[in-house]
C-alpha cells in the first residue's frame, strides 16, 4: 500500500514551534523569516526533509508560505486550500487568501521596515526580485535556515536509487536531447534545477520525492554538448554506462564552486533558480529552463506509452467503480475507498506508485479541493451524498490523473444541476478546435460558462500539464487564467472543472487530454488548428446528469465518449463488470 492514513501534522504543533522560531529570530537579529513550501530545486513537490511549512504550521498542502514575525505570523494559501488550512493551522497564524493578498501586501503592512530573513536556497530569483521591489524599506537578509535549527528530528536527505528510462519509452536518446538543446543555447551554459527537467533530459528516473519518479540533483548543460550532473554517486550504481561520455558526474558539494569558475554568460531560469545559485555566477543571463517546452511536447513514443497507461488505469477504475456500486451506503469509509482503488491499480502488476495521494472526499469532505483522508478525518460514505475521488497512477509508460464524482444513492436536484453544469464545461473544452497560438487562459473561460450562467464558479485552474512517467503536475502549460504559454501539439493537460459547496459537497470531473493538430476543414482560412485527444476512458456517472441541461451536441459527445469507453474496455473485463460498464455507458 503506497498511501498511508496517519496524521503527518497537527494544529497543536504550530504554536510551540513558532515560539522556538521566534527565539532564533532574536538570536539572529531578524524581525521575521520566510518559510516557503519549497526546496533547493524549486519544484512543486518536496521530500519529507524539505516540508518545513508543514512541520512549522501543520499545513500539508502542496503550495503555500508562512511569514513569521516577532509578534505576528501568517500562512498564505490559494483557493484550493482555504477550507483545509482552517482545520490544520492554529489560530496563532493568520490565514491569508493568496494571491489575492500577496506576501508583499501583508509584509508591507505588518513589517513596514526591518530585516526579513530567508534561506537563499528556497527563494527563487524571481520571488526575491518581486519582494525586494515591493518592499524597499525591508532588508531581505540571506541566512542559514532557521527552521532547520529547531527541527531536531528532521529527516535525512533522500537517497533513492536512480534508474534508466528505456529508449523505447523515452522516444529519444538522451545524447540527442543534449545535442538538440545545447545547440539552441545563446549562453555558454544553462543551469537546470528542476528534478523532472534533469530526469527528462538524461532519460533517468528516481524516487527522492514521494509520488514523483525523479532524483534530486543539479545539472549544467554546456553549449558544446556536454552535461555536468551534480548528484550523489551512491544513487547511480544501478545505471551502468547509461549516461555515457557526454555526462560528467560531480559531487553536489562542488556545484557552487564550479559555477563560480565558469567564464562567460550562464543561463538561469529566474522562476526556478535559487538566489544562492544566481549569486554564485559571475555573469548570469535569464531565460526559461531549456527543458520545459521540449519536455512538455511529448513525442510519439511518450504519447503511445501514455495511451497504454490510461487504458490500463481505466480498467482498474472501472473495476473499482463496479465494486463501489455494490457497497451498501453507510457501510463504506473514505479510507476503504482509497484502499480498494489502490488494490485495483496494484493488480495490474504495472503500478510503480500512485501519482499523488488519492483524494477520497465524501459529502462535505469533497469540498476540500485537495483533501487527504486520515484516520482522524475518515468518515462514512452515506446515502444521498456525493463521493469525489481524484486519483492517479505512475506506470513506467505514463502518468495518469482522473477525477470522478459518484452519487451514493439518489442525488438531490441541486447537486444534479451543479454536476451537469460542470460536465458541460468539461465537454466544451474536450470538443474545442482552436487556432494555433492560443494559450490556456484563452480556453479556461469555456469550462466556466455554464457555471457562470448560474452564478457559480471554482477557484482553481481548469487544467495542469502532466508528465510522461514524471510529475503529475508539469509546466509550463496550463488551462487557467494565468496560463500564458501557447498550447502546442504533444502537450498533455488535465481538463477538470468543478464546483464546491463548503460544508456540503464537492464536484469535479477530470479527464486528461493531449493537444494534437486538427484535420483541415474545407474552406479553412486559419493556417493551423489544434484540438484535444481524450486520453481518459472511464464512464461519467449518469445518475448525476440532467439531460435537459445538455445541448444536442453535448449529448452526442457524451454518448460517443461512453460508446468508446465501452468498446475499449469491455474485451478486457469479466462478464459481471462488463455488464456494469454496459449499463454505465448506456445512451442518454
Task: Name each region found by the language model.
Residues 1-588:
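Active-site neighborhoods and metal-handling regions in enzymes and metal-associated proteins
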Amino acid at each position: 500500500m503506497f498511501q498511508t492514513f496517519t496524521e503527518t501534522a497537527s494544529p497543536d504543533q504550530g504554536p510551540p514551534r513558532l515560539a522556538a522560531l521566534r527565539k532564533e529570530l532574536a538570536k539572529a537579529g531578524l524581525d521575521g523569516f520566510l518559510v516557503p513550501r519549497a526546496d533547493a530545486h524549486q519544484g512543486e513537490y518536496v521530500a519529507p526533509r524539505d516540508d518545513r511549512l508543514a512541520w512549522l504550521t501543520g499545513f500539508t498542502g502542496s503550495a503555500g508560505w508562512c511569514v513569521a514575525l516577532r509578534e505576528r505570523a501568517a500562512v498564505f494559501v490559494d483557493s484550493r486550500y482555504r477550507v483545509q488550512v482552517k482545520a490544520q493551522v492554529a489560530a496563532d497564524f493568520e490565514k491569508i487568501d493568496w494571491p489575492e493578498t500577496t506576501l508583499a501586501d501583508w509584509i508591507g503592512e505588518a513589517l513596514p521596515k526591518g530585516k526579513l530573513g530567508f534561506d537563499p536556497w528556497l527563494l527563487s530569483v524571481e520571488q526575491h526580485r518581486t519582494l525586494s521591489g515591493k518592499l524597499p524599506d525591508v532588508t531581505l537578509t540571506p541566512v542559514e535556515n532557521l527552521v532547520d535549527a529547531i527541527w531536531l528530528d528532521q529527516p535525512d536527505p533522500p537517497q533513492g536509487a536512480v534508474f534508466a528510462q528505456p529508449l523505447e519509452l523515452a522516444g529519444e536518446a538522451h545524447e540527442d536531447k543534449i545535442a538538440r538543446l545545447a545547440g539552441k543555447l545563446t549562453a555558454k551554459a544553462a543551469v537546470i534545477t528542476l528534478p523532472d527537467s534533469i530526469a527528462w533530459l538524461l532519460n533517468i528516473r528516481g524516487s527522492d520525492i514521494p509520488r514523483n519518479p525523479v532524483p534530486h540533483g543539479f545539472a549544467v548543460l554546456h553549449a558544446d554538448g556536454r552535461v555536468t550532473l551534480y548528484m550523489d554517486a551512491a544513487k547511480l550504481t544501478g545505471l551502468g554506462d547509461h549516461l555515457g561520455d557526454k555526462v560528467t558526474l560531480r559531487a553536489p558539494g562542488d556545484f557552487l564552486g564550479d559555477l563560480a569558475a565558469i567564464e562567460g554568460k550562464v543561463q538561469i531560469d529566474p522562476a526556478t533558480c535559487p538566489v544562492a545559485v544566481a549569486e554564485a555566477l559571475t555573469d548570469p543571463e535569464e531565460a526559461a529552463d531549456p527543458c520545459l517546452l521540449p519536455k512538455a511536447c511529448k513525442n510519439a513514443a511518450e504519447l503511445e506509452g501514455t495511451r497504454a497507461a490510461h487504458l490500463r488505469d481505466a480498467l482498474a477504475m472501472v473495476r473499482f467503480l463496479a465494486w463501489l456500486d455494490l457497497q451498501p451506503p453507510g457501510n463504506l469509509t473514505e479510507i476503504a475507498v482509497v484502499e480498494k482503488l489502490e488494490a485495483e491499480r496494484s493488480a495490474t502488476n504495472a503500478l510503480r506508485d500512485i501519482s499523488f495521494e488519492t483524494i477520497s472526499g465524501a459529502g462535505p469532505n469533497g469540498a476540500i479541493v485537495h483533501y487527504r483522508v486520515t484516520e482522524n478525518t475518515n468518515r462514512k460514505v452515506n446515502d444521498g451524498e456525493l463521493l469525489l475521488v481524484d486519483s492517479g497512477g505512475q506506470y513506467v509508460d505514463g502518468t495518469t490523473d482522473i477525477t470522478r464524482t459518484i452519487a451514493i444513492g439518489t442525488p438531490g436536484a441541486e447537486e444534479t444541476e451543479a454536476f451537469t453544469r460542470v460536465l458541460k464545461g468539461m465537454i466544451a473544452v474536450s470538443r474545442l478546435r482552436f487556432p494555433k497560438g492560443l494559450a490556456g487562459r484563452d480556453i479556461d473561460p469555456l469550462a466556466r460558462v455554464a457555471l457562470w450562467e448560474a452564478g457559480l464558479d471554482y477557484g482553481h485552474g481548469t487544467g495542469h500539464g502532466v508528465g510522461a512517467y514524471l510529475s503529475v503536475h508539469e509546466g509550463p502549460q496550463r488551462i487557467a487564467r494565468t496560463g500564458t504559454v501557447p498550447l502546442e501539439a504533444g502537450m498533455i493537460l488535465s481538463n477538470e472543472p468543478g464546483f464546491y459547496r463548503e460544508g456540503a459537497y464537492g464536484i469535479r470531473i477530470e479527464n486528461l487530454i493531449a493537444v494534437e493538430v486538427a484535420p483541415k476543414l474545407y474552406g479553412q482560412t486559419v493556417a493551423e488548428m489544434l484540438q484535444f485527444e481524450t486520453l481518459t476512458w472511464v464512464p461519467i456517472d449518469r445518475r448525476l446528469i440532467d439531460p435537459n441541461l445538455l445541448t444536442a451536441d453535448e449529448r452526442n459527445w457524451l454518448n460517443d465518449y461512453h460508446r468508446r469507453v465501452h468498446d475499449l474496455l469491455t474485451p478486457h473485463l469479466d462478464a459481471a463488470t462488463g455488464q456494469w460498464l454496459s449499463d454505465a455507458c448506456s445512451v442518454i
